[in-house]
Every structure is written in C-alpha cells, then in structure tokens.
C-alpha cells in the first residue's frame, strides 16, 4: 500500500512540476531520494501522462494549425515548431550517443535550481523593458530547440524555464506567447523522447517486472494534475510575472546545498 501511495505522490509531483519552470526531473530525483527510486519506465510513463495533459489543453490550437496550413501565419508557425523540434532531435541524439550528461545527484541539481532562478529574474527584468511582442522569430525557434537539449543535459535546469525565458530574452516578450510556443514544442519533443526510451527498455526486456497498478495510478495522477496546473499557469501569467518561481527555485537550491553540508 505504501508503494502505491508513493506512486500516486510521484505522479502528482510530475504533473505539478513538468510545465512549471521549476524542473520536474529535479523534483522527482529529490523526492526519490527519500521515497525510493523508481524504474526508468515508471518515470517515462508519468511523463507521458503530462504529455497527454498538455496535448489536451492545446487541442484546439493543434487542430487549428493542422487544418489551417493554407494560411501563411499557420504555416510559418508550424515550420518554426518543426525547426525547434528537429534541432532538439538531432543535437539531442548526438548528445545521447556521446553519453554527455551530468550525474543526477542532489548537488548539481541544487546549483541548477539556483542558477535557473537567477536566469528567470534576469529574463523578467529584461522583458519588461521590451515592447510586448508575440511573433515567434526564427532565432527564437532555433534557440528554443537548443535550450531543450541543455535542459536534458543538466538535471534541474527545467525545459520550461530554459525555453520560455530564452524566448523572452530574444524578443518574444509576451509571456503567454513564449509559454505557448514552449509547450507546443514540448509535445513532439517529449513524446519522441519517451517513445525512444520506452523502445530501448522494451528491447532490453525491462518491462516484464513492472507493477502495472502503480504505473497506472501514477500515469493518471500526472495527467490530471498536469492538466489542472497548465490551465492555471496560462491564466496566471496573463497578469503575473514568473518571479515567484524564481525565488522558489533559489530558496530550494539553497536549502538543498545547506542540507548537504
């Protein structure tokens, strides 16, 4: 029963943190430090729940883009989404083949949380002096693609934080537009990464000993929580900055570093 409870908690944690700029990977690793580690497949499945949540939130936007390619604005937006995704896929695969990734331990995660918090504050400070723009440029698309790779290499960075705030610094100063582009790019990116990782686990026969009840509970928890959090966040950022998330990251990072000493 305790294992089922921890699976539920980890699913909820994934749903809360996946699309907030606080690093879901970092929070899951911290939680697993006390609750016990889970299999790679478990972590893939709960991320899949979050992917379904964000897909459902943006279902109308996705459908509009898919059925409206006769419009230049839609074609341009889709091409930029595709560019960001392909950059992430190509560079990310090269990084994966090179086994280039920091160890998933508490100390580097703590530093990534702190640095990411400072990064958010800088981006907010710069963006508020820029005219409000919601047009995605090619430089933003390319930078977002590379930022996703950086987030994958450095646990604790946060895919949302690295992509949203780099986009804001490069001129996509309207928070909702930056967040929307980040989330839409995240759908194919996370789906592809999860599918690839799951296929690798399947080939190695590592799916035979999973507790499917725990996996299912965590999946549903991540999906429902992720949906609620994204809906809330999209409303919140219309009239608020991301600064509270920055302060939270910095505080959590400092607490973790203090705990390690």
Curated annotation (Swiss-Prot):
Keywords: Antibiotic resistance, Cell inner membrane, Cell membrane, Cell shape, Cell wall biogenesis/degradation, Hydrolase, Membrane, Peptidoglycan synthesis, Transmembrane, Transmembrane helix. It catalyses: di-trans,octa-cis-undecaprenyl diphosphate + H2O = di-trans,octa-cis-undecaprenyl phosphate + phosphate + H(+). GO terms for biological process: cell wall organization; peptidoglycan biosynthetic process; regulation of cell shape; response to antibiotic. This is Undecaprenyl-diphosphatase. Its EC number is 3.6.1.27. The lineage of its organism: Bacteria, Pseudomonadati, Pseudomonadota, Gammaproteobacteria, Lysobacterales. Catalyzes the dephosphorylation of undecaprenyl diphosphate (UPP). Confers resistance to bacitracin. The gene is uppP. The chain crosses the membrane at residues 38-58, 75-95, 106-126, 136-156, 181-201, 217-237, 241-261. It is found in: Cell inner membrane.
